[in-house]
Amino acid sequence: MDGIIEQKSMLVHSKISDAGKRNGLINTRNLMAESRDGLVSVYPAPQYQSHRVGASTVPASLDSSRSEPVQQLLDPNTLQQSVESRYRPNIILYSEGVLRSWGDGVTTDCCETTFIEDRSPTKDSLEYPDGKFIDLSADDIKIHTLSYDVEEEEEFQELESDYSSDTESEDNFLMMPPRDHLGLSVFSMLCCFWPLGIAAFYLSHETNKAVAKGDLHQASTSSRRALFLAVLSITIGTGVYVGVAVALIAYLSKNNHL
């Protein structure tokens, strides 16, 4: 009875190990580690160390019963070394044929990633959402450009030049000494209302004296006063002359009527 149970357990473990080999993955559900001598339990607990496991050392068909399975005791000292030597953590590399057989055998337990080269669109082609490419020639590629003239810079330069010329003229005017208006004062004194003309002539002399002393403020004040008095003298004189002429004409016309 014990022999039948052991044979059934051996068959179950061999099927599980064959499935693990076919899948190419480490079977974490299998609690037995396969070594060269047979199946060894991987339980580290001491209560499982006395359990015996039987396995066949030479592969044979199921119907042949020439030899009984060789039974061996579990050696806890060699257990860790045998497991580490067989299932060492490392990068596992498989050939393309093995991967293809895995994909054909079990499609739900593993997946395959395929890299396809030369699928990137070239510089003269466009890719559509459906994965198709369309080639573009040099004549089909058109770049729409927009050009316009910039005239604001020239206008800004013109305004800047005008502003600079105005500022230079103002600076030159401020740096110029005040004028004495001597000729206008003499004309107003001799030909127009002479009292205001004499005052304008006097202020023109005061302007020249202030300029000679370097007192530009006093010189400008005297110059403005001289100009004002000269213009006022000419205005009053012109009015006097016009009034005298009108009175003379009226008097002569009155005498002619008499």
Curated annotation (Swiss-Prot):
> Topological domain, Cytoplasmic: which ranges?
1-181
What Pfam families does UniProt report for this protein, alphabetically? CD225
- Give the signal sequence positions: none
Q: Which GO terms describe its biological process?
A: intracellular protein transport; positive regulation of synapse assembly; synaptic vesicle clustering
Residues assigned to the Extracellular compartment are: 203-228, 250-258
Per UniProt, the intramembrane residues lie at 229-249
Q: Does the keyword Membrane apply?
A: yes
**Entry GO CC:** cell body; dendritic shaft; dendritic spine; early endosome membrane; excitatory synapse; plasma membrane; postsynaptic density; postsynaptic density membrane
Membrane topology is: Single-pass type II membrane protein
Subcellular location(s): the record lists: Cell membrane; Early endosome membrane; Postsynaptic density membrane; Synapse
Report the principal subcellular site: membrane
Could you tell me the superkingdom of the organism this chain comes from? Eukaryota
SUBUNIT field = Homodimer. Interacts with GRIA1 and GRIA2.
**Biological role stated in the UniProt entry:** May regulate AMPA receptor content at nascent synapses, and have a role in postsynaptic development and maturation.
What the record says about family reads: Belongs to the CD225/Dispanin family.
Q: What is this protein called?
A: Synapse differentiation-inducing gene protein 1
Q: Which organism is it from?
A: Macaca fascicularis (Crab-eating macaque)
